Curated annotation (Swiss-Prot):
It comes from Drosophila virilis (Fruit fly). Residues 1-15, 839-857, 929-954 have a biased composition (Polar residues). Residues 1-32, 652-675, 813-871, 924-984 are annotated as: Disordered. Keywords: Phosphoprotein. Belongs to the FHIP family. The modification Phosphoserine is found at S500. The keyword Ribosomal protein does not apply. This is FHIP family protein GJ17503. It comes from the Eukaryota.
Length: 1048
C-alpha cells in the first residue's frame, strides 16, 4: 500500500493541516511519520477516538450549505486519508474481521464497526456527487478505501448492506465515464479484487447483477437488492466496467484481462453469467475487431538479419511492441476459449473465423510480394504455435482447407506451391510452417497432404502391396540407409576410429570394394580439434549430438510415441487392409462380377490362352502380375521367382485376390503354384477386388501422383547438393517428421526400401541413391576430400556449440544488463534508437546476396588478425557482442559465403596469419568450449525444426545445428530475429561482435584446398551421413512400435 506514503494529496494537504481545525493526537502523528507494519504499537482506544474525531470534522464540512469549495474538498480528503490510515493499522492487527452481534463481546475492529454503523460510506458517496469538478479526486479516495477494505476483509463485508450499497452506487456511476489514468488504475484494481472474491464465493454473484439503470436507482434508493423483474435486461456491472480496458497496454491491460478471465471462468459455474456475456455483452466482437486491428499494425516486411532465420521466436515478440500487443490479444482469446461457457466459446470461435481469420489472414497470406508472404506466413506459424485450444485450432485448419472463401483456391495449396520458390528465405519459412502443421498431428491436414493420395495404394505395384504391413523388412531398411553413406564419409569414419578398433576389423571385410580400393591410401592429417570433447561415429564423449546414434534412437522413440498417442485419437486408422468389412460384400458384388468378366475376356483374347499348356499359363500369370509395375522406375529390377509366393496373412493386399481370380480362369496352372496362393474354397467366393481399378491401376501406373506436397518435397530433395545448408536442414527435418508417423502407408514411401514405388517422380530411396552417386562421383575418396570433410564436420559441430552457448548466455544475462538494454531501446535520441534496433549478433545480409552456405567466406569465430592476446572472458564477449550495421554492410560487399575457408584455416593452420600470435586465441577457444561442456544442451544435427517438449537427451532449451533453438514450453522457438543478446559486454572492452553464422569478411581470407563446389558437397555429405543415421534409428523404432501393436 505505497499510496499511503506517496499520496498525491498528502503533500499538498500538509500545509493546511493546522488551519483545517484538526486536532491530531500523538498516536496519529506517530503513524504518519513511519511506515505501517504488523509491529506498529498503537492504542486501540486512541485510534478509535481519532477515527471518530476525523469523521466528525469531515462531516461538519459535508453539512456546509452550498456547493463545496476547494478548501472543503481538501479538508474532507485529508480527513478521509487519516481515516484510511487508521483503518489499515486496525486491520493489520486483526487476523479476521469479526462483525459484532447482539450478545458478543466488544468488537475487535471498532473503527470498522463505526464506519458501517454510521453509514459513512453512503454519506460520503452522496456528498461526492455534489463536488462538481472535484469529483474525480474524491472518487479516487473512495476507491482506495474500498480497495483496502476488500483486500483485507475478503467476502465478509460484501454480505453487509452498509458496505455493499455505496459500492454498487459508485460502480454504477462509473459506467460510460472517462477517467484520468490514476483513477482508471484504481478502478481496475478494485474490480480485479472483486472478481477474485467472487471466484471464491460464487453465491455472492447475484449481488452484482442489475436491471435497467432506472430500475437500479429505484432499488438502491429503496434499499432493496431483490432480483430484477423477469423480462428486464440484466447487467453484470463488474464485467461491463472491465470491457473498455481489454486492449489496454501495460499493467492496466493485464489486470483487466485477468479479471475478465475470472468472469469467464465464473460463467462455467453460473449459467446466468454465461448467458449474459454471450447475449448482451459486446466482448466477442470487441476481441475479434481488436485482434484484426492489432494485426494490421504488424510490420508488413520483416527485416531478416540472419542467414538461417525461418520463424518468429518469443525473443522477437518481446522486441517488437506491435507483435507483443497482438500476441497478448491472441493469448487472451485462447484463454477465453479454454475457460468460458460453451455459448461464449462458440460465439467467439464464429466471430474469429468470420471476422479475423478469413478477412484478415486470408488476403495477407495470398499477397504476391515475397517479403509480404514471408511475414504473413511467419505470423501464421507463430499463431499456430501459440494457440492450444482444440476449438481454435480447428478454426485455423478449416481456414487452410476452405475452398469457398478465396475463389476456389485453398490456402493450403498456395502454401504448397511456395515450396518450389527459388527464394531461400521464403522456402525456409514455408518449410518451417509445414513443420508446425505436421507437428499438430491433425488428421484432416494429413489426409489432404498425403493420405488421400496413398490410401488407394496405387503408388505400390500389385505384387508388392502385401508387404506394406510386414515388420521384418524394417530391419533391412536400417542396413539400407547405412549403406547409402557416401564413400568419403565411410573412409572418414574409419580414420576417426582408434587404432585398436581398426586392427580388429573382420578379415572378411577386406574383400569389400572399398577396402580393396583404399589399402595404400595414406591417412591424412586429421583436424587438430579431434579430442576427448567430441565424439565420432559411436564414440560419444562430449556434449555434441554429432554421430550419437543412441541419442537418435532415444529421440525417435519419444517422437514416435507422442505421434502415436495423438494419432490414436483419429477417426480412422489408415491401415492398408486387403480384406474389406463383411458389410461391404454385397455392395461390391457388382464390381467383382465386372472383374471376373474382364479376366475372362482378357484370357480368351490372348493368343497363348488357346494352347492350354501349363507353361504358357504360368507365364501369362507372371506377365499379368508385373503389369502394375511395368512402367515405373522399378520395371527393370530383378525379382526372385518366389518373391510373390511369400506367406499370406490377413494383412496382405490385393495381390492375393487377383491371383485367386486368375486361378479360376487358368486351369493349366501348376498345382504347387496354385496351392501357394489358395486361401480356402469357403472364403474364395467372398473375396472382393477392393483395391484393383482396371482403368487406372493396370494400365496407368506410370502416371500415379503422390500429391503436390510430396512432389514438392522430392523435387527439393533432388537438388540437395545445390541447396543452401539451411534449406537442407529444414528439408531433412520435414521428411524426418513425416517418418515419425506410425502409418505403414507413409513408411512404404520413406522406410521400406523393399517396396517398389510406381509414380511419376523418382521414389525417395531412388533420390537417396542418386545423391550418394553424385557425391561419390564429385567428391572422391582422396586426401583433399577428407580434409574438406573434416572442416565441414568441425564447422557444424562448432556451430552447434555456438548456438547453444548463445542461447545460454541470453538466458543467464544479469537483470541489470537487461535493464540497460531496455533503456537503450526507450532512448529519446532517434539516432540511438536506430542503432539499438539495428545492432545484432547476426550479420546483416544484403538483399542481393544469395543465401548459399558455400565455404568461401572469411568467417572466423575468433579474431585471428589481432596482435595482442586476449583473456578468456574477452574472447567470449567478442564472440557474442554486437556490431554496428555499417561495418557489417561494408564487409558484406566484399564476401558472401558460408565461412568454411576461415574455419578450415583455423583448424588446419593453413593461413599465413596463424603463424604466430595465436596461442592466446587457441587457448581462449579451448577454454570457451570447455566452459560450455557442462551445461551445453544437446541438439540434433540433421533435424532443424523442432516444436514439442524435448526428452531427457534432447533438452527443451536446445538449439539445433540447423539454427532453431528449442522452446522452453510445449511450443518451440528458433533463432531470434534480431540475434542473441549478449550479457558479457563491458564498458572497457570495445571489440567488434561476431555473427553466429556471419557471411561477412572479418580478416584475411585463408586459402583452402578444393573448389567451392567440393566444399559444398562436403557439407552435404556430412549432413546426409547424419540424416541417414537418424532415418535408420527411426526405422528401428517403428519396427518396435508395430510389433508392440500386434502383440497388444
Amino acid at each position: 500500500m505505497s499510496w499511503l506514503r506517496t499520496s498525491p494529496l498528502r503533500q499538498s494537504l500538509t500545509r493546511n493541516s493546522g488551519s483545517s481545525g484538526s486536532g491530531n493526537s500523538s498516536a496519529t502523528t506517530t503513524l504518519r511519520q513511519r511506515p505501517i507494519d504488523a509491529a506498529t504499537d498503537c492504542d486501540p482506544r486512541a485510534c478509535y477516538d481519532s477515527f471518530c474525531k476525523h469523521w466528525q470534522q469531515a462531516h461538519e464540512i459535508i453539512q456546509h450549505p452550498g456547493p463545496p469549495t476547494h478548501d472543503d474538498v481538501l479538508g474532507v480528503v485529508s480527513h478521509l486519508d487519516y481515516m484510511v490510515t487508521l483503518l489499515l493499522v486496525e486491520l493489520h492487527h486483526c487476523n479476521k474481521v469479526s462483525l459484532p452481534t447482539a450478545d458478543s463481546a466488544p468488537p475487535a475492529a471498532p473503527c470498522l464497526e463505526y464506519l458501517l454503523s454510521e453509514n459513512l460510506l453512503d454519506k460520503l458517496y452522496e456528498w461526492a456527487s455534489t463536488t462538481g469538478r472535484y469529483a474525480n479526486a474524491v472518487r479516487l479516495e473512495q476507491l482506495k478505501l474500498y480497495e483496502l477494505l476488500v483486500s483485507h476483509s475478503r467476502h465478509q463485508l460484501l454480505c453487509h448492506e452498509p458496505f455493499l450499497r455505496p459500492l454498487l452506487k459508485i460502480l454504477a456511476s462509473s459506467q460510460g465515464e472517462i477517467f484520468p489514468p490514476d483513477l482508471e488504475k484504481r478502478l481496475v484494481i478494485l474490480l480485479n479484487q472483486l472478481c477474485v472474491v467472487l471466484m471464491q464465493n460464487v453465491h455472492l454473484l447475484d449481488l452484482f447483477f442489475f436491471s435497467a439503470q432506472t430500475q437500479v436507482q429505484e432499488q438502491i434508493q429503496n434499499g432493496s437488492l431483490a432480483a430484477p423483474k423477469s423480462g428486464t435486461t440484466t447487467n453484470f456491472i463488474i464485467f461491463s466496467l472491465l470491457i473498455p480496458y481489454v486492449h489496454r497496454e501495460g499493467s492496466l491491460g493485464h489486470q483487466a484481462r485477468d479479471a475478465l478471465l475470472l468472469c469467464m471462468a465464473l460463467s462455467q459455474k453460473n449459467s446466468n453469467i454465461g448467458h449474459y456475456i454471450a447475449q448482451y455483452s459486446s466482448i466477442c466482437p470487441l476481441l475479434v475487431t481488436g485482434l484484426g486491428g492489432l494485426y494490421s499494425r504488424l510490420p508488413n516486411s520483416i527485416e531478416i538479419s540472419s542467414i538461417d532465420w525461418h520463424r518468429i521466436t518469443p525473443d522477437d515478440v518481446t522486441e517488437i511492441p506491435e507483435l507483443t500487443l497482438f500476441m497478448n490479444a491472441l493469448e487472451f482469446c485462447n484463454a477465453v476459449v479454454q475457460v468460458a461457457h460453451e455459448m461464449i466459446k462458440q460465439q467467439l470461435l464464429d466471430f474469429m473465423y468470420q471476422g479475423f481469420i478469413v478477412p484478415v489472414l486470408g488476403p495477407a497470406i495470398l499477397q504476391t510480394n515475397i517479403d509480404s508472404q514471408i511475414s504473413a506466413m511467419s505470423y501464421l506459424d507463430l499463431i499456430l504455435r501459440s494457440i492450444t485450444e482444440p476449438g481454435l485450432m480447428r478454426a485455423f485448419v478449416k481456414f487452410l482447407l476452405d475452398t469457398e472463401k478465396f475463389d476456389g483456391e485453398r490456402i493450403l495449396d498456395a502454401l504448397v506451391e511456395r515450396l518450389h520458390s527459388p527464394d531461400a528465405n521464403l522456402c525456409m519459412v514455408t518449410m518451417a510452417l509445414f513443420d508446425t502443421l505436421l507437428g499438430l498431428h491433425c488428421e484432416d491436414l494429413m489426409l489432404e497432404l498425403l493420405l488421400k493420395y496413398l490410401l488407394p495404394g496405387k503408388h505400390v505395384p500389385i505384387s508388392h502391396r502385401h508387404k506394406i504391413n510386414k515388420i521384418d523388412p524394417y530391419l533391412n531398411t536400417t542396413e539400407f540407409f547405412l549403406d547409402l553413406t557416401p564413400d568419403v564419409m565411410k573412409r572418414a569414419r574409419d580414420l576417426a576410429r582408434p587404432k585398436s578398433v581398426q586392427d580388429q576389423v573382420d578379415p572378411a571385410a577386406a574383400t569389400a570394394p572399398l577396402a580393396v580400393m583404399l589399402p595404400s591410401l595414406p591417412s591424412p592429417v586429421m583436424s587438430k580439434t579431434i579430442g576427448a570433447n567430441w565424439n565420432y561415429y559411436g564414440h560419444y564423449t562430449g556434449d555434441s549430438l554429432y554421430a550419437n546414434v543412441q541419442a537418435y534412437l532415444f529421440e525417435a522413440h519419444s517422437r514416435i510415441a507422442q505421434c502415436q498417442r495423438d494419432c490414436a485419437k483419429w477417426a480412422n486408422s489408415y491401415r492398408y487392409q486387403k480384406w474389406p468389412r463383411q458389410g461391404q460384400a454385397r455392395a461390391n458384388a457388382h464390381a467383382l462380377e465386372l472383374a471376373k468378366q474382364f479376366f475372362s475376356e482378357f484370357a480368351s483374347a490372348a493368343p497363348m490362352a488357346a494352347a492350354g499348356t501349363s507353361d504358357l499359363g504360368e507365364k501369362q500369370l507372371d506377365s499379368l502380375q508385373s503389369i502394375g509395375e511395368s512402367s515405373g522406375y522399378e520395371s527393370f529390377k530383378w525379382r526372385p521367382a518366389d518373391e510373390d509366393a511369400e506367406g499370406i496373412d490377413v494383412t496382405t493386399t490385393t495381390a492375393t485376390s487377383d491371383t485367386d481370380l486368375e486361378h479360376n480362369n487358368s486351369s493349366s496352372i501348376g498345382s504347387g503354384r496354385r496351392d501357394s496362393w489358395r486361401i480356402s474354397h469357403s472364403t474364395r467366393n467372398e473375396l472382393l477386388l477392393t483395391d484393383l481399378d482396371f482403368s487406372e491401376d493396370l494400365f496407368a501406373q506410370g502416371t500415379v501422383s503422390l500429391g503436390p506436397f510430396l512432389n514438392a518435397i522430392w523435387s527439393k530433395l533432388q537438388t540437395f547438393t545445390s541447396n543452401s545448408l539451411y534449406v537442407n536442414l529444414h528439408l531433412t527435418g520435414l521428411i524426418t517428421r513425416l517418418a515419425w508417423y506410425p502409418l505403414p502407408l507413409i513408411h512404404s514411401l520413406l522406410l521400406r526400401s523393399d517396396i517398389a514405388i510406381t509414380s511419376d517422380t523418382p521414389s525417395f530411396h531412388q533420390v537417396l541413391r542418386m545423391l550418394k552417386q553424385q557425391i561419390d562421383a564429385e567428391l572422391p575418396v582422396a586426401e583433399n576430400s577428407l580434409e574438406i570433410i573434416d572442416v565441414a564436420r568441425s564447422y557444424l559441430i562448432d556451430r552447434e556449440f555456438r548456438l547453444v552457448n548463445a542461447r545460454k548466455i541470453t538466458d543467464n544475462a544479469p537483470m541489470h544488463q537487461q535493464h540497460q538494454q531496455q533503456q537503450l531501446q526507450h532512448t529519446t535520441n532517434p539516432t540511438q534508437q536506430q542503432q539499438a534496433q539495428q545492432r545484432s549478433t547476426y550479420a546483416t545480409l544484403s538483399a542481393a546476396t544469395p543465401v548459399q552456405a558455400s565455404p568461401t567466406s572469411a568467417y572466423d569465430p575468433f579474431r585471428r588478425s589481432d596482435n595482442k592476446r586476449r583473456s578468456i572472458s574477452k574472447s567470449i564477449s567478442s564472440m557474442f557482442s554486437r556490431r554496428s550495421t555499417s561495418s557489417t554492410a561494408a564487409t558484406n560487399t566484399n564476401t558472401a559465403s558460408s565461412g568454411l575457408s576461415q574455419i578450415y584455416a583455423f583448424f588446419t593452420g593453413a593461413a599465413s596469419t596463424l603463424v604466430g600470435g595465436n596461442n592466446g586465441e587457441v587457448s581462449a577457444r579451448g577454454a570457451a568450449q570447455e566452459q560450455s561442456r557442462g551445461n551445453t544442451c544437446e541438439t540434433s544435427l540433421s533435424t532443424a525444426p523442432r516444436q514439442e517438449a524435448q526428452t531427457a537427451v534432447v533438452s527443451s532449451s536446445n538449439s539445433s545445428i540447423g539454427g532453431s533453438t528449442q522452446t522452453l514450453s510445449a511450443t518451440h522457438s528458433s533463432s531470434t530475429l534480431h540475434g542473441v543478446e549478449s550479457g558479457l559486454q563491458t564498458g572497457s572492452f570495445n571489440s567488434e561482435p561476431v555473427s553466429l553464422d556471419s557471411v561477412a569478411s572479418m580478416g584475411i581470407i585463408a586459402n583452402t584446398s578444393g573448389t567451392e563446389r567440393s566444399r559444398d558437397l562436403a557439407l552435404c555429405a556430412v549432413l546426409l551421413d547424419e540424416w541417414l543415421k537418424e532415418l535408420a534409428a527411426i526405422a528401428l523404432e517403428q519396427s518396435v512400435v508395430l510389433v508392440t501393436e500386434q502383440l497388444l
